[in-house]
Amino acid sequence: MYSLLETELKNPVGPPTPAAGTGVPAAPGAAGKSGANPAGGANAGNGGSGGANGGGGGGGGGGSDQDRVKRPMNAFMVWSRGQRRKMALENPKMHNSEISKRLGADWKLLTDAEKRPFIDEAKRLRAVHMKEYPDYKYRPRRKTKTLLKKDKYSLPGGLLPPGAAAAAAAAAAAAAASSPVGVGQRLDTYTHVNGWANGAYSLVQEQLGYAQPPSMSSPPPPPALPQMHRYDMAGLQYSPMMPPGAQSYMNAAAAAAAASGYGGMAPSAAAAAAAAYGQQPATAAAAAAAAAAMSLGPMGSVVKSEPSSPPPAIASHSQRACLGDLRDMISMYLPPGGDAADAASPLPGGRLHGVHQHYQGAGTAVNGTVPLTHI
């Protein structure tokens, strides 16, 4: 074993052979780097070979490749020189990189006793190298291939002419700086998220706006705050099937709302509404609620009445038509002969009479609002 190593290592700095390269044609002075990749992986778990390779360097003070000083071989390189030649002779078509992979795997399978002679030889070569080149320092070459790859896979802006990307960026910055409403335009593009087209939401807000009475001297509210509308409570009609207590409570609430100006009524109309509900047992409560609501003052202007109130003549005509439809709907569910039994039976006739009185009183008291009889 040692005789074979001595014959192979007589000229460790001699010209390299093509088999000692790492997959590419070896340049002069590149034999020191042969098999370096598997050697690094193999020496990572081997303390002796790592120590043997610790003082290596890759470049001397010379400027050309011929004057460059090679690094001393480590234990793996010493072992792989003979093995690489043997494997290349056995498999002439095998690529050099595949040979290096197999050599690295075989080196890891060796035991420490089998690696010991190669580790000792690597230490001896390192000591000789340090004596010959005491001022040697490893200076790695610049990797030009990686830089070329980075330039090759650059951003798509590299496809443009040299000054096109910078000119486009400058034009975009100038346009953004000269536009004072750039932020507003960007915000307008997000109005589609809520289902409104650009500017449609503001148009709806303008249509829903209302004019305050001229008696109001307070300044208008800020436009940023959303306008909250309240609707006329007296316009909501309730079923006559409700118990008397609930009807009196709702009638009192409607009278209080009307007296406070929520429906846009005058105080005299509010008094008339309170008088219209005088037959209910909650007259005192309604009067107290109306007196308390009158103290609200200008808060009534915040409330919006129904905008679709028809004139009184049309309201009375539609009211009669709705009452006729309601009579037909109720008669559908009465037993056969219900029309003849209306006069004899007090219950259905009284019920319809109560419906007539309820809707007539509510319609005359509340600003001509159409009752919601279709509900």
Curated annotation (Swiss-Prot):
KW Transcription (keyword) present: yes
Keywords: Developmental protein, DNA-binding, Nucleus, Transcription, Transcription regulation
Motif (9aaTAD): 325-336
Biased composition (Gly residues): 42-64
Pfam family, one: HMG_box
InterPro entries on file: HMG_box_dom, HMG_box_dom_sf, SOX_fam, SRY-related_HMG-box_TF-like
MF-aspect GO terms: DNA binding; RNA polymerase II cis-regulatory region sequence-specific DNA binding
Compartments, record wording: Nucleus
Cysteines joined through disulfide linkages: none
Keyword Transcription regulation: yes
Extent of Low complexity compositional bias: 19-41
Tissue specificity: Expressed in developing parathyroids of mouse embryos between 10.5 and 15.5 days post-coitum. Expressed in the developing central nervous system. Expressed in the developing urogenital ridge.
UniProt xrefs under PROSITE patterns: HMG_BOX_2
GO biological process: animal organ morphogenesis; face development; forebrain development; hypothalamus development; negative regulation of neuron differentiation; pituitary gland development; regulation of DNA-templated transcription; sensory organ development
Quaternary assembly: Interacts with SOX2 and FGFR1.
Comment text on domains: The 9aaTAD motif is a transactivation domain present in a large number of yeast and animal transcription factors.
Protein name according to UniProt: Transcription factor SOX-3
Native source organism of the sequence: Mus musculus
